[in-house]
């Protein structure tokens, strides 16, 4: 029987009793190998996306940045703070104003959130985050699904009843939207 390989402790979370708080999470050492998000005292830890995932994030955020009106700002992997002890790191965001500072940005400052889903994050992205983003009043939620031969994207807009409504869907790997501003996003396979 072989001895277990040595575990690199820099990638392990410290022992912690009770629910996690926002302060607990923000005091963790920086770790570029994984995402650590917080919902109601529980941590969601996931690896960074694959190369295909990162290409989709880059192309979507690059297209949004190119079309973005000057008063808005496009970012990637930003700590977005929601009511209570909730912290998500969306793949990309469009902020309502330029020049965000600090370790976190309040959800009230976010116009659009984009997520590229994967097998390990699908339920969180499509169910949990959708609900939290809607409750926080984030106007637009762009979901990109790379799981098909041709990636698919869906843009949701927050409706009057506080629920997201689909307003655009990609065709043949291309998403064209008019709101929150006109842009065409080509989704690489």
Each language-model region and where it sits:
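Gly/Pro/Ser/Thr-rich low-complexity, intrinsically disordered segments predominantly at protein N-termini
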Residues: 1-189
């Amino acid at each position: 029987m072989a001895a277990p390989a040595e575990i690199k402790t820099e990638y392990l979370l410290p022992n912690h009793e009770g629910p996690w708080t926002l302060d607990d999470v923000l005091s963790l050492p920086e770790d570029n190998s994984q995402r650590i998000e917080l919902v109601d005292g529980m941590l969601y830890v996931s690896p960074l996306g694959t190369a295909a995932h990162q290409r989709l994030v880059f192309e979507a955020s690059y297209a949004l940045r190119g079309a973005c009106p000057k008063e808005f700002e496009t970012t990637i992997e930003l700590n977005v703070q929601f009511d209570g002890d909730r912290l998500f790191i969306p793949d990309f965001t469009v902020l309502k104003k330029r020049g965000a500072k600090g370790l976190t940005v309040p959800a009230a400052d976010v116009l659009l959130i984009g997520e590229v889903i994967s097998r390990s994050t699908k339920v969180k992205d499509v169910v949990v985050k959708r609900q939290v983003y809607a409750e926080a009043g984030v106007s637009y939620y762009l979901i990109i699904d790379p799981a098909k031969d041709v990636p698919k994207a869906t843009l949701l807009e927050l409706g009057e009843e506080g629920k997201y409504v689909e307003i655009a869907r990609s065709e043949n790997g291309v998403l064209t939207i008019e709101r929150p501003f006109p842009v065409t996003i080509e989704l690489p396979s």
